[in-house]
């Protein structure tokens, strides 16, 4: 009997970015950034989310870089010209992940991150090691990062991160 339980949701940030990038209208970077942040915030509010979720491990990998805006802006425009560029897609996905971490920090909700081996055909196991998140973990020390699937097969690495960083959970 579930009547005594409250069920809450979380949702993927990648869907928000994908919806914007797949529109026929080409946006300048400032408008993309504005819409992404506004849409993530709206998703949290409308769905009463208790966390955000990312599958970045399965798209461009866990080595998320905190990049200067100039570099993100340039990568965004290159990506609009060549949507097959994995390097420029990574720049955009890293930017979106970092922006979501900022929102999570501000709203005091966690970011749930898929780690370990996934089911996507784009998944590169070497890019799924939780230790690859070193830069972003340090950059967003006030964002709670829940690294799920025990980092398998990198369980020891996930344990190391949980032991050394107060903002990392598994």
Describe each model-derived feature in a short phrase.
Residues 1-110:
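Active-site gating/metal-coordination segments in enzymes
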Residues 61, 75-170:
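Catalytic pocket-lining loop regions of alpha/beta-barrel enzymes
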């Amino acid at each position: 009997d579930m009547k005594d339980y409250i069920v809450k949701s979380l949702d993927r940030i990648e869907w928000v970015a994908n919806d914007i990038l797949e529109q026929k209208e080409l946006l300048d970077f400032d408008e993309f950034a504005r819409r992404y942040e506004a849409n993530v915030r709206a998703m949290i509010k409308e769905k009463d989310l208790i966390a955000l979720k990312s599958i970045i491990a399965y798209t461009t990998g866990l080595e998320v870089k905190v990049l200067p805006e100039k570099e993100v802006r340039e990568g965004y425009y290159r990506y609009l010209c060549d949507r097959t560029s994995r390097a420029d897609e990574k720049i955009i996905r890293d930017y979106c992940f970092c922006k979501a971490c900022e929102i999570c920090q501000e709203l005091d909700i966690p970011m749930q991150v898929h780690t370990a081996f996934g089911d996507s055909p784009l998944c590169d196991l070497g890019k799924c090691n939780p230790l690859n998140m070193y830069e972003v973990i340090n950059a967003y020390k006030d964002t709670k990062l829940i690294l799920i699937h025990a980092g398998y097969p990198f369980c020891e690495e996930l344990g190391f991160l949980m032991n050394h960083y107060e903002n990392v959970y598994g």
